[in-house]
Structures are given as C-alpha cells and as structure tokens.
C-alpha cells in the first residue's frame, strides 16, 4: 500500500493579502518580497500578485476599512441622521485609535500615506465613498433620512470631511478632532 503524502494547497493571491493583513495588524511595514518568501512563492509571483508595497498596503487598509464601515453601520444607534452620525463617530474613533493604522501613518511620509488612503487613485477613498453612497441611498429609499443632495455627493462630502479631520495633523498641522468632524457632518446632513 502506497503512503499518501498530504500536500498544502498552492498559495493564492488572497493568501498573500491575508498574510499582509496579519503583518500590518502587528504594526509591521509590508515587504512584498519577504511576504512572498514567507508564503513560499517567488519574488516575481509575489510582486505580480500584490503590485508594489504601496499597492498592497492600500489593499490591506481598504479591506480593514470595509469591514470597519460594515461593523459601524451595524452597531450604530439612533434613527435617521443620528444613526448616520453615530456610525461616522464610531468609524472615526476606531481609525484614530487603531494602533497599527496610526503606526502606518507615522511611519510613512504624509504624501505616500495620503496617496494610499485619501486619493481617488488609492483603493481606500473610492471604496469609502461607494460604501457611504450605498448606505445613504438605502436610508433615503427606506424613508429613514432625506438629503439635500444626491447620495453620491453627500457620501463624497462625508468622506472628505472625515479625512480632513482624521488626518489634520498630516495635511494641515492641525490637531485631529473627531468632535469637530461630527459637528461639520451634522451641518452637511441637515
């Protein structure tokens, strides 16, 4: 009788992103070649799957931001605009206090980090706008809220307001202030 050898399934691009997420959460800078080696794939394959470090970091942050948004919406208290503002407050507080994210912002130069998280060319901002737009549209269609502009425009305004106050230290030398962000959002949503 022949002995069966169990083989590990071949790694996939998703495995690389999952491994990168674990490294990011430990507060480590992502190194595509090192991650590829850890996963048992060639450097060329790792770069083909991930792009460069900046692209991979953006994918990881986008995946974390997506999950955070869903959780904040689910946990939001209140009705109507209060519910929207509670979800926004929860998201901003989480991002401001998430040590691996703050480590990333402190480690990278401001231009690089903003290009990843607060630019139309990065993966995070377009995702955030899309998620906000979909949620706002659902709330409008269900009659829970009324907006003075279309859901896309409001989503864009809310995301950019969040960025302005969450990253105030990086982009304007101001102190981060979540309460001010929520106050401005309240004015936008009236």
Q: Model regions: which residues?
A:
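Amphipathic alpha-helical segments used for helix-helix packing
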Residues: 96-119
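C-terminal peripheral helix-coil segments that are non-catalytic and often amphipathic
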Residues: 1-6, 93, 130, 134-142, ...
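Short, amphipathic alpha-helix enriched in basic
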Residues: 10-34
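Amphipathic alpha-helical packing segments from all-alpha helical-bundle domains
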Residues: 115-144, 152-159
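Hydrophobic alpha-helical connector segments
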Residues: 59, 72-101, 154-158
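Central "turn" residue of the DNA-binding helix-turn-helix
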Residues: 39-40, 51
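HTH DNA-binding helix-turn interface
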Residues: 24-29, 47-59
């Amino acid at each position: 009788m022949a002995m069966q050898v169990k083989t590990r399934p071949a790694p996939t691009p998703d495995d690389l992103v999952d491994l990168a997420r674990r490294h990011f959460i430990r507060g480590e800078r992502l190194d595509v070649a090192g991650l590829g080696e850890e996963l048992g794939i060639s450097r060329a394959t790792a770069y083909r799957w991930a792009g460069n470090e900046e692209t991979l970091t953006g994918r990881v942050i986008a995946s974390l931001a997506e999950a955070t948004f869903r959780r904040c919406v689910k946990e939001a208290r209140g009705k109507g605009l209060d519910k929207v503002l509670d979800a926004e407050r929860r998201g901003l507080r989480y991002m401001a206090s998430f040590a691996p994210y703050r480590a990333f912002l402190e480690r990278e130069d401001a231009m690089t980090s903003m290009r990843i998280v607060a630019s139309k060319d990065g993966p995070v901002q377009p995702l955030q706008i899309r998620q906000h737009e979909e949620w706002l549209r659902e709330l409008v269609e269900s009659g829970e809220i009324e907006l003075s502009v279309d859901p896309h425009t409001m989503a864009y305004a809310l995301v950019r307001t969040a960025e302005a106050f969450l990253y105030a230290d990086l982009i304007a030398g101001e102190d981060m202030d979540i309460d001010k962000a929520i106050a401005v959002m309240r004015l936008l949503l009236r």
